[in-house]
Regions:
Chain A
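An interfacial alpha-helical scaffold signature
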Residues: 1-258
Length: 258, 88
């Protein structure tokens, strides 16, 4: 079967065709197809998606896809990443014609997205809090101490009710504090970069720690250093964090250039 | 020594899992008739997400299976998913 389809990794603002000579998925030669000042990073492929039941093979595909995006960030000062396995078919024309048509039709939205992501990378920030420390602090608060004091000398039934009340109150105050922490971190980081999203976390790695919030931020070097500095100041006060990246700005291009 | 190694592997794995999560779930989607998406991608996504789920399970139970070990041996790939951890 001839390679008459195009696998598209991402879009850069280049404006002319370039035989980039980077090795993409399965070692395929990656080059650019340009239209209206934008260039798609592509390789020739068959009209079928890349798939495998072998996890190692899948890993290779994902790493290869991202390697090209990482190189593009360095070479072109940014990249608009496309969804993994975006393959343009030939149809009644050529796949190249179809891609150029799409670039042309989406020029304005590509410009807008490029302005946002140029010179910036995406980072994942996981902020954890010390749950035990928080519960201890809340348990020692005046409000809870008053309930405990009231329990003294009371009969078993009333004492039990007050104990339940204290537990419920600890829970309520605890959650209020957690939500307050979350909002404060979000607001403080937002002061550094407006491009910030709370990401639902599906992955829990450090089970000894409780995840306060999982964020994706789009930041340049200066901004991410500022964010790191800010987070480092919080270390030792019952918080810790993990920062991963830079990645291609996956979380900041969705539904904007489609 | 072992704890340091495990800590480093965990840092690395967080970078890997974050990267996979983004690659499979995010990015620009071309809404064009001539893009292979309609019939094939849901199947592909299900397949890949199954692999991702197995990684999460391995990480959850602290098992560093074959799926991840080769990645940690490749300098080029390590560079691409550099992860920084700062803790107490």
């Amino acid at each position: 079967m001839p390679d008459d389809a195009l696998y598209v990794y991402g879009i850069v603002k280049l404006g002319f065709d370039l035989d980039w000579r980077e090795a993409g998925i399965e070692g395929k030669n990656v080059y650019t197809i340009s239209e209206c000042g934008f260039s798609a990073l592509v390789h020739d492929c068959e009209e079928k998606p890349y798939m495998s039941e072998d996890p190692n093979k899948i890993k290779e595909l994902i790493i290869a896809h991202n390697k090209i995006l990482d190189r593009a960030i360095n070479h072109f000062d940014g990249v608009i990443p496309l969804h993994f396995n975006t393959i343009i078919k030939k149809g009644g024309n050529s796949s190249q014609y179809n891609l150029k048509k799409w670039l042309n039709n989406n020029k304005e939205r590509l410009e807008k997205t490029w302005d946002k992501i140029k010179g910036r990378g995406e980072y994942g920030i996981r902020i954890y809090y010390d749950k035990e420390k928080l519960i201890e602090e809340v348990s020692n608060s005046e409000e809870i101490k008053d309930i405990e004091t009231n329990r003294e000398g009371k009969g078993a039934g009333l004492s039990y009710l007050l104990q339940s009340k204290a537990k419920t109150k600890i829970n309520e105050i605890g959650w209020d504090k957690v939500n307050g922490f979350k909002k404060k971190f979000y607001d403080d980081i937002k002061k550094v970069t407006a491009n910030l999203k709370i990401t639902p976390s599906r992955i829990f790695i450090d089970e000894e720690k409780d995840l306060l919030v999982n964020l994706s931020v789009l930041a340049d070097n200066q901004q991410i250093n500022k964010i790191k500095g800010f987070l480092e100041q919080k270390i030792g006060n019952g918080f810790s964090f993990q920062l991963a990246g830079p990645f291609a700005p996956y979380s900041f291009v969705e539904n904007e250039t489609a | 020594m072992l704890l340091t190694l495990l800590s480093k592997m965990k840092q690395h794995n967080i970078g890997i899992v974050e990267l996979i999560d983004r690659t499979l779930n995010k990015g620009v989607i071309l809404n064009a008739d001539l893009v292979i998406t309609v019939a094939d991608v849901p199947l592909l996504a299900a397949n890949l997400k199954l692999a991702l789920a197995s990684v999460e399970t391995m990480l959850k139970y602290g098992v560093m299976g074959d799926w991840l070990v080769p990645v940690s041996l490749n300098k080029e790939e390590n560079k691409a998913i550099e992860t920084v951890e700062i803790k107490n």
